[in-house]
Amino acid sequence: MQQASTPTIGMIVPPAAGLVPADGARLYPDLPFIASGLGLGSVTPEGYDAVIESVVDHARRLQKQGAAVVSLMGTSLSFYRGAAFNAALTVAMREATGLPCTTMSTAVLNGLRALGVRRVALATAYIDDVNERLAAFLAEESLVPTGCRSLGITGVEAMARVDTATLVDLCVRAFEAAPDSDGILLSCGGLLTLDAIPEVERRLGVPVVSSSPAGFWDAVRLAGGGAKARPGYGRLFDES
């Protein structure tokens, strides 16, 4: 049964199909989500440039469809031009809709801070250029990237085909390269990470913040109503 106290949560998603990311039904099966798709062509700066100017229009569309809060559910889309751009984009969405708005980059920052992670090992789906922009963004936000291991993927649909074993191995390699890290950021909203997160946390004993789960966590908190995720998906949901 839908929880009446929680308003509809609007999500701007990279794929053109405009579907609510699969994590939503697993984490918050009773909450109302709607989505609008940007049609991102590639997970590269050139791909982001082609769609970033339409984000505010998608936010307006979601507001007209009944959203009470809006999140841009793309991590690299919101960090690739830096911290000031992420903040300005959030303001532009809010001013255009009159709604509380957020981004996935803001979500991962909030998640890392909620878990006390300052020194962060990066495990990403990205190519090197995007990894460098992520590290610079985190540094602007007073976090310390300790190293990075990545998959080098540029295809939007390819992200969802990365299996759990590959994600666990990626996180383990990222942490083993920087074992003094406080935790791990598993970055890219297209990765399906819910099964990997608890396994990595069990193996390594450090928290994992992952883009899509953090995006849902952040948007639900912004919406209010006190909804809790189903248990078993990691420290971000269990401890914050």
UniProtKB/Swiss-Prot annotation:
Class of enzymatic activity (EC top level): lyase
Transmembrane segments: none
Pfam families the UniProt entry points to: Amdase
EC number: 4.1.1.76
Gene Ontology molecular function, alphabetical: arylmalonate decarboxylase activity
Keywords recorded for this protein, A-Z: Decarboxylase, Lyase
Catalytic activity: 2-aryl-2-methylmalonate + H(+) = 2-arylpropionate + CO2
Protein name in the entry: Arylmalonate decarboxylase
Organism for this UniProt entry: Bordetella bronchiseptica (Alcaligenes bronchisepticus)
